[in-house]
């Protein structure tokens, strides 16, 4: 259910873009993200930090897009989110000395410290590369290609990278945890 809720604003954005335009899609994205946030709070009595950060950025960049009638703001939102994620991962590893991935998953998984560090760094690099790809596609290719990349390309890349991370984790799990 939670995964569906995470993707709902993206689906709404895509549908409104195809039916109307980028500005209607942006307004719909703001509303859908707010509804998902409210529903999460009412249903689960919890809102994850990532969801809250994403909501704030959607409202800020979406609001700027609508106010100035300029789609560049909503295009930048994707890169800013990825930069924040990458930054949080890198700060957790290099400043706080405990990778964020480890903080999030250590209750469920037992892995050697170097594996946590490599996994954390890999996700940081992944987010940086996705942010850079977004900049290129958003500002050098037509808007419709960017929307398709945002909805399908980044989603597919994230699913593939998650699968690869799962394989990497499985290879380094203690034998007793694999069963």
Swiss-Prot record:
Q: Which PANTHER family match?
A: INNER MEMBRANE-SPANNING PROTEIN YCIB (PTHR36917:SF1), INTRACELLULAR SEPTATION PROTEIN A-RELATED (PTHR36917)
Q: Which residues lie on this side of the membrane: Periplasmic?
A: 1-21, 71-75, 142-148
Q: What's a GO cellular component annotated to this UniProt protein?
A: plasma membrane
- Intracellular or extracellular location(s): Cell inner membrane
Species source reads: Shigella flexneri
Q: Which residues form a coiled coil?
A: none
Transmembrane residues, as ranges?
22-42, 50-70, 76-96, 121-141, 149-169
Q: How does it sit in the membrane?
A: Multi-pass membrane protein
> Does the record's keyword annotation contain Cell division?
no
Q: What is the similarity comment for this entry? A: Belongs to the YciB family.
> Which domain of life does the protein's organism represent?
Bacteria
Entry function: Plays a role in cell envelope biogenesis, maintenance of cell envelope integrity and membrane homeostasis. Essential for normal cell division. Involved in virulence through intercellular spreading.
Instruction: Spell out which residues lie on the membrane's Cytoplasmic side.
Output: 43-49, 97-120, 170-179
**Name this polypeptide is given:** Inner membrane-spanning protein YciB
Alphabetized UniProt keyword annotations: Cell inner membrane, Cell membrane, Membrane, Transmembrane, Transmembrane helix, Virulence
Q: Give the gene that encodes this protein.
A: yciB
